[in-house]
């Protein structure tokens, strides 16, 4: 077979896809958006009832906090490994398929855990962690593929359309779970039905693969053949020396956001409380989560707009939002708990979007990749610590949980204020 790098591209072929079947960039962007929509239905649908599911299998609050916190940490920290791996190997599609397959398989498999007797809880914990590892495996490679498609239509518009479809799945998944759980009167059928959007995500991804060139191939093919071999560009590697050269203001900001992450109780622990204390019917738990995801989307848009106009000061709201959550979400009043969950969603929206914008402002362009890797590692460590702490304190004393998170957020607020002051003085 002729190697792509040994031939020059022509009008009929780009990379490894003939022009006659190749999709336009916009169709590829929308295609990736549909994949994310379907996959988010699977993951977010499961996330909306992780707490009640683990509780039904005999988990304590501290175990729920540990597993949900560790899952979020894995999804963040392991990207430091799989991002460079995708660039070094060029296997963007392989890693993307592998990550989505883990989600499509592990989440519906949770439906069998209630029938595994004493092993059910352990198997459920492993499946939850494996699904989150899948997120880390696919995210860097998928984002590179999306950027390859979106480059022709504008990265801003392309990523915005993709994010809108992604958020639609984050709302639709919990709504589907709520409907099935209400009809069935139990949780496992709601997990089982998620095999449908999971399979759809893989089928659409396979379809896109047939219609879109592989970046690793098309970039090699589009490069003119030189008479002498060009020196191979160095592969990205994780270097602690680069990390240690990041400015002090970045480390202050990472510490502030780490404290905010540690205090942001996972929805697993919140939903555990909502069902254990019968604050709301179990079928309402995913509905409340869907509303929180809508709040997250609105908060991300609003905080992003305010950030562009007023700078990082908008992020001072994050520790305040986080501190308010446990005081409301862990009450036995349904209206107060729902308000607490909506505030939790707003905090998630700010944390997952606008926080990352300030990172880019605090470090030189040449060290942004390193900075985002370090930032993800700090947030991951904080997620494990915070999830475990919240679960342990919930089992012992709710007032202690509320007071501890308030103290952590006061620390985050001070660190954030110092960060903004130093950034202003630079």
Predicted regions and their residues:
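Helix-to-loop junctions at the C-terminal end of transmembrane segments
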Residues: 78-91, 181, 298-311, 394
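C-terminal transmembrane helical hairpin of 12-TM major facilitator-type secondary transporters
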Residues: 310-355
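Juxtamembrane intracellular "pre-TM" segments in multi-pass secondary transporters
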Residues: 3-26, 210-256
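Cytoplasmic helix-loop-helix junction between adjacent transmembrane helices
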Residues: 127-168, 358
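Helix-loop boundary and gating motifs at the non-cytosolic
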Residues: 18-73, 249-288
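Cytoplasmic membrane-interface "Motif A"-like loop-to-helix N-cap segments
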Residues: 88-101, 308-320
